[in-house]
Amino acid sequence: MSFLANEASSESIASFSKPEIMSSFLPEGGCYELLSVIGKGFEDLMTVNSRYKPTGEYVTVRRINLEACSNEMVTFLQGELHVSKLFSHPNIVPYRATFIADNELWAVTSFMAYGSAKDLIGTHFMDGMSELAIAYILQGVLKALDYIHHMGYVHRSVKASHILISTDGKVYLSGLRSNLSMISHGQRQRAVHDFPKYSIKVLPWLSPEVLQQNLQGYDAKSDIYSVGITACELANGHVPFKDMPATQMLLEKLNGTVPCLLDTSTIPAEELTMSPSRSIANPGLNDSLAAGSLRPANGDSPSHPYHRTFSPHFHNFVEQCLQRNPDARPNASTLLNHSFFKQIKRRASEALPELLRPVTPITSFEGSQSQDHSGILGLVTNLEDLEVDDWEF
């Protein structure tokens, strides 16, 4: 059944997209100059880099063809728009406007000029980011999760591609469409049992109790497990359990396989002297140390990409997040006071741009003059390298 054939659903979606509900941008398609398609997803979802004409600001417009939406997807979108209306936090991606344009739902957000954390490790930090950069990023994520959990929701999709970084180095958590309320009939439930829809892309990050789908269910502590997996993803340059069949992944997690940070304290010394292709792959830790690239310099023997040492505080932080028993995991508020974050001395907006060098925000490719078309072309070219189809605003 097409979306427009379902009048009740159409009216419900439209009610969430009235201008008084979302913030500051005009809810009119003519106000946006669509520059380039930078991502496509399921259900005819299209992400377009755009310019908001009244101010010249770059924005991201997510366009969803409502005629192609299934009824299940309509329900999914209604939940996402409801949460977007409900939440207001400096570390959660805000909607600037949502509205219906012809047969499409348009959702407008500020453009994140550094892209996602996944973009960064995929293009510049293939062997992982610095510990301090990760501390700043995860602090922003945990602040967002602490708010979400206090609002009675479970996020269920914490991963690097849902961590966005703005031009000024601010960290935002996205992926709100996967959020699930733990409130039922006015009461907060001790556990929920719903398995995330469209979850195939988030399986490596899901906790054992979510994957197990048993009568015990899961709660907000499942997000903490995902934070631990994301910490490994940012530090190692790839997510644990990557490309592992779902059944094997479940068995590894249920049997207590715990991913870790890859450095001199977790990799045997003899492996650090081998080329990555000879290193032993440990399921759950990394698919293959060959994922790291060697960097020879001046003809010298190449060093192993994981010949580094993370602090004991960082290792302990990850261990706390990845405990098999969810009751043993700290909550987001407690983790924000973990010793791992003591190294943070400045605001993320002041420190992250320096820590992410030589990466520059994409808006820096824009010319100084508004009619500099070469600057626009450079911006569009660099946008095409981003994996924005994974950004779920």
From Swiss-Prot:
GO molecular function, one term: ATP binding
PTM-bearing positions, type Phosphothreonine: 381
Cross-referenced CDD domains: PK_STRAD_alpha
Chain positions with Phosphoserine modification: 2, 9
Keywords: Cell cycle, Cytoplasm, Nucleus, Phosphoprotein
PROSITE patterns registered for this protein in UniProt: PROTEIN_KINASE_DOM (PS50011)
UniProt domain Protein kinase: residue ranges: 32-341
Tissue note: Expressed in liver.
Keyword Phosphoprotein: yes
Segment forming the signal sequence: none
A single GO cellular-component term on record: nucleus
Domain of life of the organism encoding this protein: Eukaryota
Similarity annotation: Belongs to the protein kinase superfamily. STE Ser/Thr protein kinase family. STE20 subfamily.
Subunit structure: Component of a trimeric complex composed of STK11/LKB1, STRAD (STRADA or STRADB) and CAB39/MO25 (CAB39/MO25alpha or CAB39L/MO25beta): the complex tethers STK11/LKB1 in the cytoplasm and stimulates its catalytic activity.
Record function comment: Pseudokinase which, in complex with CAB39/MO25 (CAB39/MO25alpha or CAB39L/MO25beta), binds to and activates STK11/LKB1. Adopts a closed conformation typical of active protein kinases and binds STK11/LKB1 as a pseudosubstrate, promoting conformational change of STK11/LKB1 in an active conformation.
Comment text on domains: The protein kinase domain is predicted to be catalytically inactive.
Name recorded for this polypeptide: STE20-related kinase adapter protein alpha
Source organism (scientific name): Rattus norvegicus (Rat)
Taxonomic placement: Eukaryota, Metazoa, Chordata, Craniata, Vertebrata
Gene: Strada
